[in-house]
């Protein structure tokens, strides 16, 4: 699963990506300094692993990870090929969700492509380019449905009517993800790889001074928040400069710096966690002396399929899963104490995994 970082040029995308990944994507003061997308694998913050390490003192610790892609800055007219538009849009098509970085800071040394800071306008510019790209796809889908309906089949005719409604919606500059429709219609639309149908998190990139102030009183941040609330999306406020500094510190110094700022968690840790949730992902845990590990699965995954994430033999020969909730394990301190209290459950093939389940899979092949 991939999260694509998008935004206009010079909004801080590459600075944020570099802080996330410890990489060195181009972060120069001009458009298109990132042309081919940079890809980074980022660990998902999970304090539960720290607690399990206290209990087991493992030889190895492996967190869950998520993939971030830094996509070059979009510009107005990208859907018609302006800038390096078509190439950039194709990169966005390959990701599962969008991290939309919005500039909410003033800095005379960093040019803004529009000449002045305007978060609402910038969001509209990016969203409109995605919508315009989608209109072309939807119109082609309508044509195919109508051709298929000539044989008298009513199903493609109904599908054509749905996509005509969607086309009108897109024609008003509205994103497909906010299109009012039934669950069945959503599934049909999901078959069409629409850019504006991808879930989104808005990142409000603030100056150090504004980040330390009252965000509710910040007019630039409020512009982002109001748009996100209207479409049911999330906003993660961060300061790219602070995150860049944090990324270069040792863990102990980083924690001290966060405490000085009055923060429990960095903005980027909050972004990674929000992205994981946006993709519908959860983690189950395995724990022992050799390794403590978080495994990524989608919400709704059943126990045998979760076992298959570890090894295909675990799924093929699944017998049952011994499961304890993390909070119960934390309270007991050891697996032996948890078993003595009857907190370790035996679950079968229909068990739906929960976030934070600590599991031992029993299998036979």
Question: What do the PLM-derived regions correspond to, one by one?
Answer:
Residues 6, 32, 37-40, 47-49, ...:
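Short capping/connector residues at structural and topological boundaries
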Residues 32, 46-49, 62-68, 82-96, ...:
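Amphipathic alpha-helical transducer elements in NTP-driven molecular machines
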């Amino acid at each position: 699963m991939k999260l694509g970082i998008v935004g206009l040029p010079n909004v801080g995308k590459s600075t944020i990506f570099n802080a996330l990944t410890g990489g060195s994507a181009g972060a120069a003061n001009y458009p298109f300094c990132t042309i081919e997308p940079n890809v980074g694998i980022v660990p998902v913050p999970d304090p539960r692993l720290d607690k399990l390490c206290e209990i087991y003192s493992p030889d190895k610790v492996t967190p869950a990870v998520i993939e971030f892609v830094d996509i070059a800055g979009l510009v107005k007219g990208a859907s018609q090929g302006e800038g390096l538009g078509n190439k950039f849009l194709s990169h966005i098509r390959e990701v599962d969700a969008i991290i939309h970085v919005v500039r909410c800071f003033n800095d005379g040394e960093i040019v803004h492509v529009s000449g002045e800071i305007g978060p609402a306008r910038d969001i509209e510019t990016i969203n409109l380019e995605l919508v315009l790209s989608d209109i072309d796809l939807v119109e082609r889908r309508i044509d195919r449905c109508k051709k298929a309906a000539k044989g008298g089949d009513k199903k493609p005719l109904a599908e054509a009517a749905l996509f005509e409604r969607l086309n009108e919606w897109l024609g008003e500059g509205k994103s497909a993800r906010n299109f009012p429709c039934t669950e069945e219609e959503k599934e049909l639309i999901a078959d069409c790889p629409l850019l504006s149908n991808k879930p989104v998190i808005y990142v409000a990139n603030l100056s150090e001074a504004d980040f330390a102030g009252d965000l509710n009183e910040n007019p630039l941040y409020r512009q982002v928040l109001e748009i996100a609330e209207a479409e049911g999306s999330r906003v993660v406020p961060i300061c790219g400069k602070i995150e860049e500094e944090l990324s270069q510190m040792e863990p102990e110094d980083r924690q001290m710096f966060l405490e000085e700022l009055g923060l429990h968690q960095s903005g980027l840790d909050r972004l990674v966690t929000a992205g994981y949730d946006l993709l519908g992902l959860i983690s189950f845990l395995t724990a022992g002396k050799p390794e403590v590990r978080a495994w990524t699965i989608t919400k709704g995954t059943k126990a045998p399929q979760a076992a298959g994430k570890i090894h295909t033999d675990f799924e093929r020969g699944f017998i049952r899963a011994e499961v304890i909730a993390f909070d119960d394990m934390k309270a007991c301190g050891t697996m032996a104490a948890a078993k003595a209290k009857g907190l370790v459950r035996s679950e079968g093939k229909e068990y739906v995994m929960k976030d934070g389940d600590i599991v031992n899979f029993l299998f036979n092949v």
